[in-house]
Amino acid sequence: DPAVDIFDREARFIEQVMEPIRQHFPELKIVFEHITTKEAAQYVQAGNRFLGATITPQHLMFNRNHMLVGGIRPHLFCLPILKRNVHQEALRQAVASGSDRFFLGTDSAPHLKHRKESSCGCAGCFNAPNAIPAYAAVFEQLGALEHFEAFCSLNGPRFYGLPLNEDFIELQRVPTTQPEEIALGNESVIPFLAGETLNWSLKD
């Protein structure tokens, strides 16, 4: 609904769409994809085993002040849009709780640099190269590393009723600076956290 403010749409969606669906189909499994608000986090926590949600690394690490204060940072512009810090904190507490109904969802979007840095830029963060180390940094900050593997690898497939992946990756606590940009032919893509240092990296 274009009449609903972009920062209010998630809460309105819960009220007008999600709750009526769940009332009509109480045992329908629903994944609330890429939640961004305190209302959504609380709604999932108050729900039953048929309701889950994914959360992106950018919504755990940033809020709208990071995107807008002191100049627009187009590479943090994504949809659903970043919200107030109170919503960011609610998401962080949700993943730190260890609830098995929250799980990884990167929503990675590798838009070309010139399509992000324009008068009408594309929405999305290209976090595929470093999403796992970024999530690890969040869980470490929250003192919740014991829930990190489940959030990334176990909660999702168990919710969907799928077998767990038998392959594995290993992280090491080695600070790694993220590239400023990634060449793509004659173009380039700016990765999530470009130029910043993460304390975790994937082990070769």
UniProtKB/Swiss-Prot annotation:
Top-level taxon of the source organism: Bacteria
Any Pfam family matching the protein: Amidohydro_1
Catalytic reactions of this protein: (S)-dihydroorotate + H2O = N-carbamoyl-L-aspartate + H(+)
Record's GO cellular component terms: cytosol
Disulfide feature: none
Gene Ontology biological process terms, A to Z: 'de novo' pyrimidine nucleobase biosynthetic process; 'de novo' UMP biosynthetic process
Pathway(s): Pyrimidine metabolism; UMP biosynthesis via de novo pathway; (S)-dihydroorotate from bicarbonate: step 3/3
Binding annotation for substrate: L79, H111, A123
Binding site for Zn(2+) 2: H34
EC code: 3.5.2.3
Binding positions (Zn(2+) 1): D107
Keywords: Hydrolase, Metal-binding, Pyrimidine biosynthesis, Zinc
GO molecular-function terms, A-Z: dihydroorotase activity; metal ion binding
Cofactor: Zn(2+)
Enzymatic class: hydrolase
Cofactor binding remark: Binds 2 Zn(2+) ions per subunit.
Catalytic residues, chain numbering: D107
UniProt function note: Catalyzes the reversible cyclization of carbamoyl aspartate to dihydroorotate.
Family listed: Belongs to the metallo-dependent hydrolases superfamily. DHOase family. Class II DHOase subfamily.
Subunit details: Homodimer.
Name of this protein: Dihydroorotase
